[in-house]
Amino acid sequence: MSTIRKPSPPDMYDCIVVGAGHAGCEAAMALARMGHATLLLTGNADRIGHLSCNPAIGGLAKGHMVKEIDALGGMMGLWADEAGIQFRTLNSSKGPAVRATRAQIDRDAYLRVVRRDIFAQPNLRVWQDMAESIIVEGGRAAGVRTAYGQEFRAHHVLLTTGTFLQGRIHVGLNNFPGGRLGDAPATGLSASLRAIGLELGRLKTGTTPRLLRDSIDFSLMEVQPPDDPPRPFSFRGPGVRLPQLPCHVTWTNERTHEAIRAGFDRSPMFTGVIKGTGARYCPSIEDKVARFPEKERHQVFVEPEGLESPECYPNGIPTSLPLEVQKAMIATIPGLENAQIVRPGYAIEYDYADPVQLRSTLETKALRGLWLAGQINGTSGYEEAAAQGLWAALNVSCTLRSMPPFLPGRDTAYMAVLVDDLVTKGTREPYRMFTSRAEHRLLLRENNADARLTETGRALGLVDDTHWQRFSTKRAALHSLLDELENRRITPDAAARDIFSRLGEPAPTKGVSLADILRRPSLTLPDLAPFWEGVTRFADDVREEAETIVKYSGYLARQQELVARSARMEDTVLPEDMDYTVIPGLTREIVEKLGKVRPHTLGQAARISGVTPAALTCLEIQLRKMGQR
């Protein structure tokens, strides 16, 4: 990886990253590590990498993306491992496709490790200021103007502004400007984006009140212990470092719901004060009570904010109700009867750009050199933001180096499903990733993210020598173990029959491979040790992946067949300037949709709502005609 000098403000940057949340930090680190002169612009340098909402990273589909970021050489997994205080594997009793890692994070520790690495990174400069407008020259983005009157020039500008664009905070019927509680919003940038030609909408998200830990009676709650041993996110890091803490579980009740309903007339959501659309899959507690009146209780996870933090986060009750209603509501929940609120829950409205206005690289269609990543694209969640930040950074780098873009398929990464959904379908509400959004999710397991993406990260210059060596060693061990399992055969002699008897399994009538034995539903890889003690020599992660590949070989083969069947459409590129109005057989509605989305491939065109098989045939015929010309 090349190293260049740290530039001064008047110099030309390769890329300016505006916003230092999860998308911005991931993007800035990746660009700088790949040798590009990068400026990270933030309104508050003390809160770089701040966890604005819940103190947790990972979860269903989200943990998968953290692993993918790590496999490509990104940072979130390493940072989470260093600051994690409770690691749990979700869906551990279910199939490998939906098992996911989630970690409670020490909020202050995470901030420290992110800031440490950002400020120590060569090629990366931090500047505290607010971007006010995009500089446009020669039909492309050329830099930003700031509130301090500075002009910073760059070949590319990447906006990762989170909830800060015209952000407005609501607590009851009181509201005021803010990017999050305690930080000013970005007030000028939205007008600049509209002038460029981007259409902006309005979204809403919310967070819970924070509670004083010493005022909580944990004895009235169910204890949720961490996994022992903890399973880290990073394939390449030193593992989990901090002591592990429990979380606690309690529930709302009818008294809670009565207190909430009593505040409906002062709710900014129910009185129409909030205009932005909220997250369908992370509703406020007042929304849950209103929409599900038949539910007698809702779960609340009381999560530690850190090893030394005096605060706890009651996950499950985000709210924008007035403070007095929040107090009354909290006081009805078992264990929280005497809990003191340190910070109120609140909702925040902010501007976003419908991502259908982006290319698959996350560059805007309206202006070359301008890129968007994170919540500005209508997503919710730290992991979705970080994945987009890395995606955009890799594509900025590819553009700077005149390389083909980084565009993995939906069968290769959850982050590819995320981006494809965004740029193909757009979104009118905060988008959250789920495993159900991926049609090839058995291929997209947490434990094979490195196998799927590390080679790509190496080719792009983000995977360093140490990471590559560790991956290569693991890959060689996996191939060796799989080879042994397929080729080492067991003859059903007396000794073998005795082993099968002790395992409670019928002995085979003829010679079988170890892989054949492992495919039995009740057996796991350690059960094979009496047949071949060499199985114990392999690391746990190698054995886990080998067991998955063997046990699910039939399902995996069928998924690969489906991928191969659709490969032709995914590999058929549509010209960006294709004139859909002249193609015979396309309806006006389909012409409008194709013209708006400008799909990169025939496969992407097929995923646009309303584009029919007949329309795809028309596109194929037109491509053949163009090829003949």
Curated annotation (Swiss-Prot):
Subcellular localization: Cytoplasm
GO MF term set: flavin adenine dinucleotide binding
Keywords attached to this entry: Cytoplasm, FAD, Flavoprotein, NAD, tRNA processing
Superkingdom assignment: Bacteria
Positions of NAD(+) binding: 278-292
Required cofactor(s): FAD
One GO term of the biological process aspect: tRNA wobble uridine modification
Keyword NAD: yes
DNA damage recorded as keyword: no
GO cellular component, one term: cytosol
Pfam families in UniProt: GIDA (PF01134), GIDA_C_1st (PF21680), SAM_GIDA_C (PF13932)
Binding annotation for FAD: G19, A20, G21, H22, A23, G24
Record InterPro entries: FAD/NAD-bd_sf (IPR036188), GIDA_C_N (IPR049312), MnmG (IPR004416), MnmG-rel (IPR002218), MnmG-rel_CS (IPR020595), MnmG_C (IPR026904), MnmG_C_subdom (IPR047001), MnmG_C_subdom_sf (IPR044920)
PROSITE patterns: GIDA_1 (PS01280)
Function in brief: NAD-binding protein involved in the addition of a carboxymethylaminomethyl (cmnm) group at the wobble position (U34) of certain tRNAs, forming tRNA-cmnm(5)s(2)U34.
Family in the record: Belongs to the MnmG family.
NCBIfam families: mnmG_gidA
Protein name: tRNA uridine 5-carboxymethylaminomethyl modification enzyme MnmG
Lineage: Bacteria, Pseudomonadati, Thermodesulfobacteriota, Desulfovibrionia, Desulfovibrionales
